[in-house]
Swiss-Prot record:
<feature type="region of interest" description="Disordered">
    <location>
        <begin position="518"/>
        <end position="627"/>
    </location>
</feature>
<keyword id="KW-1003">Cell membrane</keyword>
<feature type="transmembrane region" description="Helical">
    <location>
        <begin position="151"/>
        <end position="171"/>
    </location>
</feature>
<dbReference type="GO" id="GO:0004934">
    <property type="term" value="F:mating-type alpha-factor pheromone receptor activity"/>
</dbReference>
<dbReference type="GO" id="GO:0000750">
    <property type="term" value="P:pheromone-dependent signal transduction involved in conjugation with cellular fusion"/>
</dbReference>
<feature type="compositionally biased region" description="Polar residues">
    <location>
        <begin position="519"/>
        <end position="533"/>
    </location>
</feature>
<dbReference type="InterPro" id="IPR001499">
    <property type="entry name" value="GPCR_STE3"/>
</dbReference>
<keyword id="KW-0297">G-protein coupled receptor</keyword>
<comment type="function">
    <text>Receptor for the BAP2 pheromone, a prenylated mating factor. The receptor/pheromone interaction may have a role in the fusion of clamp cells.</text>
</comment>
<dbReference type="InterPro" id="IPR000481">
    <property type="entry name" value="GPCR_Pheromne_B_alpha_rcpt"/>
</dbReference>
<feature type="topological domain" description="Cytoplasmic">
    <location>
        <begin position="91"/>
        <end position="102"/>
    </location>
</feature>
<keyword id="KW-0812">Transmembrane</keyword>
<keyword id="KW-0675">Receptor</keyword>
<feature type="transmembrane region" description="Helical">
    <location>
        <begin position="36"/>
        <end position="56"/>
    </location>
</feature>
<feature type="region of interest" description="Disordered">
    <location>
        <begin position="479"/>
        <end position="505"/>
    </location>
</feature>
<feature type="compositionally biased region" description="Low complexity">
    <location>
        <begin position="372"/>
        <end position="387"/>
    </location>
</feature>
<feature type="topological domain" description="Extracellular">
    <location>
        <begin position="1"/>
        <end position="7"/>
    </location>
</feature>
Length: 627
C-alpha cells in the first residue's frame, strides 16, 4: 500500500535535518548546551525517520535488521531527549550565571537520562522490533500497566517541570528587568533577543510535546487492550521475533494511525519551529554570508554578479553635474586665499550704510522725576520721531547717537564698530542702588548717569545709550562700570540699534534674551542727585518677577506713573505731593560740556540701600563683574 504522506514526509524530515544542523556551529561556540542537545536530538530523530520512510515506503520486509535495532533506540531516546533538552533550556534561562556547572547538568539530563531511559525500556519490550509499512522500524512495547510509568509518563513529566521553570524564569525576568538586562548585555553569548527566542522555543516545544504525550497515553490505552505484567519470562518469551505489519492493517485503526503519525511528524515540526526562531536572526544571517563566501571561493565564482548595461550615458565633462562639481572645486580652491581682514572691512563699510525705518522701534514711557496727579492713556507709547518734554526723539540712525555701547560677537570681532576686547578697559563694576521712596513703582528708580561711555547690563527695565547730550536711565541693581578715561579709544560711529547683551568685566560677549539697549534724548542735567553705590555681592544672581521680566505693572500704579509724567511734562506738579528724590550720583563724563555733578542731602546709609532692594531676585543671566 502506498504511503499517502510520501514524498511529503521525507522532504520535511530532510528539511528538519538541515534546519537543525545549520545553526549548530555557532550555538556550539556560545556553549548553549540545552539548545545544542535539542538540535542534535531533533536532527537525529529526523534522520532516523527520513531513512525509514525511504527504505520502507511500500513494504514491510526485514531488509536492515541492524539498522532497525539502532532505529528503535533512537526513537525511544528522542522521545525523552527532546523534552529533556527543552527542560535544560528553561533551567538555564532561570539561572544563567553558572555556565560550567550548567553545561555539566545539561549533559547529564540530555545524554545520561535518555540512555537510562533506553535501558529501562527492555523491561516492557516484548520482542526485538516491529516493521510498519510506510513508517519503518518501530519499538515493540507491550501495553501493560508498567509501560505507562516507564515509557509514556516521562515526556509529560519533563514537560510539566519545564513549564514550572519557564514560569519562574519569566517572573524573575519581569521582576528584575533592569538588572537582568544589564547582566545580559554584559554576557557576550546571550542577549535579550536570544533570551526571549530561547524562552519562546522552549514554551512552544512544551505546548507541543506535553499535550501530545497525554494524547498518546490516551490513544494507547484505547487502541489496544492493556495486558497485565506477569513476569520477565512471560514478557520476553520469543524475544527474537520481528513483527512485520502491512499498512492496510495498522491504517485500519484510526487511533493507531493518529499515534504513529504524531510520533513521526513531531520531530520535523520541532526542527522547523527551531529554525523559525533562530534561522533568521542576525548571527544566522552573518554565518550564512560567511558560508556563501567560502562556497563562492571554493567554486571560483566572482564576488559580485556584473550588472546589465544600461541605456543611460555615463557622465562626461560637459554634463551639468560635472560642471557644477568643477565650479564648486574652483570656489573651494579659492578659499585658501580668503582674507578675513578684507572681508570684515568690506562688511564694516556696508554696515555703516545700513538704515532702519524711523518708526519701527517703540520706546517705553520715560520714568517720572516728580509725582503728579494727572496722567495719560495707558495705550500711549513713545516712538522715534515723537516728542517728550518738548523735545523730538531722533531716530537711532541719526548722527546724534555717536557713541553706541560696544558689543562683542563671538567669531565677529571686527564686524562694523563692534570693538575687540583690547579696545575696552576692565574697570571695577558697581551695583547701582537707591533709597526706597514712596513713589518708587515696583521698587524701580531711574538714575541719571552723565557719562557717554557707560557700558552696563540691566536685569530689568531699559538702558539708554547715546552721546553726552542725552540721558541714560539705569534701573535699580544695574551693574555700571566706571566711566571712560581720555585715553580710551573712541568707538566708530554706528547706528545704535536695539540689541540684547549681557555684561561682564570687559563687556565682551553677546547673549540673547537678556536686555534691551535703546537710545534716549532727555536732558542729563535735569533732576540728578547723589547715587549711592556698593560693591557687587558675591552671592548668586537673582531671578526677576513676571512684571519686571515682561514690563507689566498694575493699572493703578501705571496710571499714577502716567499722571506723574504728565505733571512733570506740564510743570504742574504739586509741591505737597512731591516726595524727596532718592539719592543718586552723577558720574561726570570725560567731555567738558557736561554739567557738573550735583548731589542731594539725602543720606546714603546701609539701611536705605537695603530698604530699596526689590523682593524678587535679579535675572540669573546677569553676570556681575567682580573687582
Amino acid at each position: 500500500m502506498l504511503d499517502p504522506t510520501y514524498p511529503a514526509f521525507p522532504i520535511f524530515a530532510f528539511l528538519g535535518i538541515v534546519c537543525c544542523l545549520v545553526p549548530l556551529p555557532w550555538h556550539l561556540q556560545s556553549w548553549n548546551s540545552g539548545t545544542c542537545f535539542l538540535m542534535i536530538w531533533t536532527a537525529v530523530a529526523c534522520l532516523n525517520m527520513f531513512v525509514n520512510s525511504i527504505i520502507w515506503k511500500d513494504h514491510a520486509q526485514n531488509v536492515a535488521p541492524v539498522w532497525c535495532e539502532i532505529s528503535i533506540r533512537i526513537t525511544l531516546g528522542a522521545s525523552v531527549g527532546i523534552p529533556a533538552s527543552s527542560l535544560c533550556i528553561v533551567r538555564r534561562l532561570y539561572s544563567i550565571a553558572k555556565k560550567f556547572r550548567a553545561v555539566m547538568v545539561d549533559a547529564l539530563i540530555c545524554v545520561l537520562f535518555p540512555i537510562l531511559y533506553i535501558i529501562l525500556q527492555i523491561v516492557v519490550q516484548g520482542h526485538r522490533f516491529n516493521i510498519l509499512e510506510n513508517i519503518g522500524c518501530f519499538p515493540a512495547i507491550i501495553n501493560t500497566p508498567l509501560t505507562y510509568p516507564l515509557t509514556f509518563m516521562w515526556p509529560v513529566l519533563i514537560g510539566v517541570i519545564s513549564f514550572i521553570y519557564s514560569t519562574l524564569a519569566l517572573i524573575q525576568f519581569n521582576r528584575h528587568r533592569l538588572q537582568f538586562t544589564q547582566f545580559l548585555h554584559s554576557n557576550s553569548t546571550l542577549s535579550v533577543s536570544r533570551y526571549l527566542r530561547l524562552m519562546a522555543l522552549a514554551m512552544t516545544e512544551m505546548m507541543c510535546t506535553t499535550p501530545m504525550g497525554v494524547f498518546v497515553i490516551i490513544l494507547n490505552a484505547k487502541a489496544t487492550p492493556v495486558s497485565p505484567y506477569v513476569s520477565w519470562a512471560v514478557t520476553h518469551y520469543g524475544y527474537g521475533r520481528i513483527d512485520q505489519v502491512p499498512a492496510i492493517i495498522w491504517r485500519s485503526n484510526r487511533l493507531l494511525v493518529a499515534s504513529y503519525e504524531l510520533t513521526r511528524w513531531s520531530s520535523p515540526a520541532i526542527a522547523l519551529i527551531f529554525f523559525f526562531y533562530f534561522g533568521f536572526a542576525q548571527e544566522a544571517r552573518r554565518n550564512y554570508a560567511a558560508a556563501w563566501g567560502w562556497v563562492r571561493r571554493a567554486v571560483g565564482l566572482p564576488e559580485r554578479v556584473p550588472s546589465l548595461p544600461t541605456t543611460k550615458k555615463p557622465f562626461s565633462s560637459s554634463d551639468k553635474g560635472s560642471g557644477f562639481a568643477e565650479k564648486f572645486a574652483a570656489k573651494a580652491k579659492g578659499l585658501s586665499s580668503f582674507n578675513v581682514k578684507d572681508f570684515t572691512s568690506e562688511f564694516t563699510s556696508k554696515a555703516h550704510d545700513f538704515t532702519f525705518k524711523a518708526k519701527q522701534y517703540t520706546l517705553p514711557r520715560p520714568m517720572p522725576q516728580t509725582p503728579s496727579s494727572s496722567g495719560f492713556s495707558s495705550s500711549d507709547s513713545t516712538r522715534f520721531g515723537s516728542s517728550v518734554d518738548g523735545k523730538e526723539l531722533p531716530s537711532p540712525t541719526t548722527k546724534e547717537f555717536s557713541s553706541p555701547i560696544p558689543i562683542h560677537l563671538s567669531g565677529m570681532q571686527t564686524l562694523a564698530s563692534f570693538d575687540s576686547n583690547k579696545d575696552l578697559p576692565s574697570p571695577p563694576a558697581y551695583d547701582v542702588e537707591a533709597q526706597y521712596g514712596p513713589y518708587n513703582i515696583d521698587n524701580r528708580v531711574s538714575y541719571h548717569i552723565a557719562d557717554a561711555g557707560v557700558r552696563a547690563s540691566y536685569p530689568m527695565g531699559v538702558a539708554y545709550s547715546s552721546d553726552s547730550e542725552h540721558r541714560r536711565i539705569v534701573p535699580q541693581h544695574s551693574t555700571v562700570p566706571q566711566h571712560n578715561t581720555a585715553d580710551e579709544p573712541a568707538s566708530p560711529a554706528l547706528p545704535d540699534t536695539p540689541s540684547s547683551c549681557s555684561s561682564s568685566a570687559t563687556f565682551s560677549t553677546l547673549q540673547s534674551r537678556d536686555f534691551i539697549v535703546l537710545p534716549s534724548t532727555t536732558d542729563v542735567t535735569r533732576g540728578t542727585g547723589s547715587l549711592p553705590t556698593r560693591r557687587s555681592p558675591a552671592g548668586p544672581p537673582r531671578l526677576p518677577s513676571l512684571s519686571q521680566l515682561f514690563g507689566i505693572s498694575s493699572m493703578t500704579r501705571e496710571r499714577d506713573v502716567e499722571a506723574q509724567v504728565e505733571d512733570v511734562a506740564t510743570g504742574t506738579a504739586s509741591p505737597t505731593t512731591t516726595a524727596p528724590a532718592p539719592a543718586s550720583t552723577t558720574i561726570a563724563p570725560a567731555s567738558a560740556t557736561m554739567a557738573p555733578a550735583t548731589t542731594t542731602t539725602a543720606p546714603t546709609t546701609i539701611a536705605n540701600i537695603q530698604r530699596g532692594e526689590p523682593d524678587v531676585p535679579a535675572s540669573p543671566r546677569t553676570h556681575r563683574a567682580s573687582v
